[in-house]
Swiss-Prot record:
Organism: Mycobacterium marinum (strain ATCC BAA-535 / M)
Coiled-coil stretches noted in the UniProt entry, renumbered to this chain: none
Family: Belongs to the acetokinase family.
Keywords: ATP-binding, Cytoplasm, Kinase, Magnesium, Metal-binding, Nucleotide-binding, Transferase
Bound cofactor: record note: Mg(2+). Can also accept Mn(2+).
Positions that bind Mg(2+): N14, E373
Name listed for the protein in its UniProt record: Acetate kinase
Lineage, opening ranks: Bacteria, Bacillati, Actinomycetota, Actinomycetes, Mycobacteriales
Active site (UniProt): D137
Binding-site residues for ATP, renumbered to this chain: K21, H197, L198, G199, N200, G201, D271, F272, R273, G319, I320, G321, E322, H323
Enzyme class at the top of the EC tree: transferase
Binding site for substrate: R80
Length: 388
């Protein structure tokens, strides 16, 4: 009798400048075989000098769990790539030509794309016999309506330099909107949804009938909601003002807006659990930071209610969205006249998994939906394998 074939698995890699997250996932069952995160890559005190060493460490971790990539049913390596620009909006089989084009997109995402491209090169060298596939954060928002995607700036400049609203966290927004429809037992085409992805990076989207019609992030992941270290929406005049008066260079300003702004800039803390403790201790900076975060979030919810006209579902996801009941409560407070009423008991319940937290008589259903970007990436990879 022949041995049964192992279930197919995809190794999903999500590379940052100093970190490498990985998950070995079965796209058909949704089961995770292994997951982990290599941090502090390249730091002086780290034992992991570069991404080559980090990926080799991933293989060691898998081997320690008795997982052999050669015999476990590995069918693809999926790479999360933050920015696909105008040209990449489908899961894409990686080759030298594609990787070269991704390198050229680095100015659009200087903090995110270079480490992803580096990881792709290392992974292809270490696993040369397995298809490597890029899945883009921007893909879901590729077909935003022109009125939502277009910035009101000089059209020639915008066309030459490919300036538009690209949107990010698209894999999460797509997955959560699909899971919300499945939870409600309704066709996604019949639902108008608002998805709030709230983590250290945060974004909102409006999804009509399964297609995005608005999102908060723009040309880069810097626009939109207040985030852990990013400012979100900002008067562009601030950049010129700091350049002229504070004598800061563009790179310094960009670094400040990405790494020393948001909750960290306002309160000196980006972790919401520690921020909550600071608020409980009466820290005025922490209180203000929280108020600014909630105010911005409520503005976007209100705007998207108007954009959609009729809203069926609001879903919270990602670390803060899934686990911080106070954020959910304060975001939707006083919106009963807009059709949104929370059930306080349901909202405060710490149970995991997809769940309804709105009142039974709320015209708009409010859900908590755990995101699973790795599973979504793995399934996108399999769609490419079917097509080739």
């Amino acid at each position: 009798m022949s041995a049964s074939r192992p279930n197919r698995v995809v190794l999903v890699l999500n590379s940052g400048s100093s970190s490498l997250k990985f998950q070995l996932v079965e796209p058909d069952s949704g089961m995770s075989r292994a997951t982990g995160n290599i941090e502090r890559i390249g730091e002086e005190s780290s034992s992991v000098p570069d991404h080559d060493a980090a990926l080799r460490r991933v293989f060691e971790i898998l081997a320690e769990d008795d997982i052999d990539l050669q015999s476990c049913g590995l069918v693809a390596v999926g790479h999360r790539v933050v920015h696909g620009g105008k040209d990449f909006y489908e899961p894409t089989l990686l080759n030298d030509a594609v990787i070269g084009k991704l390198d050229e997109l680095s100015p659009l995402a200087p903090l995110h794309n270079p480490p992803a491209v580096l990881c792709i090169r290392v992974a292809r060298a270490l696993l040369p016999d397995v298809p490597h596939i890029a899945v883009f954060d921007t893909a879901f928002f590729h077909q935003l309506p022109p009125a939502a995607a277009t910035y009101a700036i000089d059209r020639e400049l915008a066309d030459v330099w490919k300036i538009r609203r690209y949107g990010f966290h698209g894999t999460s927004h797509e997955y959560v909107s699909q899971q919300a429809a499945e939870f409600l037992g309704k066709p996604i085409g019949d639902l108008n949804q608002i998805v709030l992805h709230l983590g250290n990076g945060a974004s909102a989207s409006a999804v009509a009938g399964g297609r995005p019609v608005e999102t908060s992030m723009g040309l880069t992941p810097l626009e939109g909601l207040v985030m852990g270290t990013r400012s979100g929406d900002l008067d562009p005049g601030v950049i010129g003002y700091l350049w002229r008066t504070a004598k800061l260079g563009v790179d310094e300003i960009e670094s400040m807006l990405n790494h020393r702004s948001g909750m960290l800039g306002l309160a000196g803390e980006r972790d919401f659990r520690r921020l909550r403790a600071m608020i409980d201790d009466g820290d005025p900076a922490a209180e203000l930071a929280y108020d600014v975060f909630i105010h911005r979030l409520r503005k976007y919810v209100g705007a998207y209610l108007a954009v959609l006209g009729h809203t069926d579902v609001v879903s919270f996801t990602a670390g803060i969205g899934e686990h911080d009941a106070a954020v959910r409560r304060d975001t939707l407070a006083g919106m009963a006249e807009l059709g949104i009423s929370l059930d306080e008991r349901r909202n405060a319940c710490p149970s995991g998994g997809a769940r309804r937290i709105s009142a039974d008589d709320s015209p708009v259903t409010v859900l908590v939906i755990p995101t699973n970007e790795e599973l979504a990436i793995a399934r996108h990879c399999c769609s490419v394998l079917v097509a080739v």
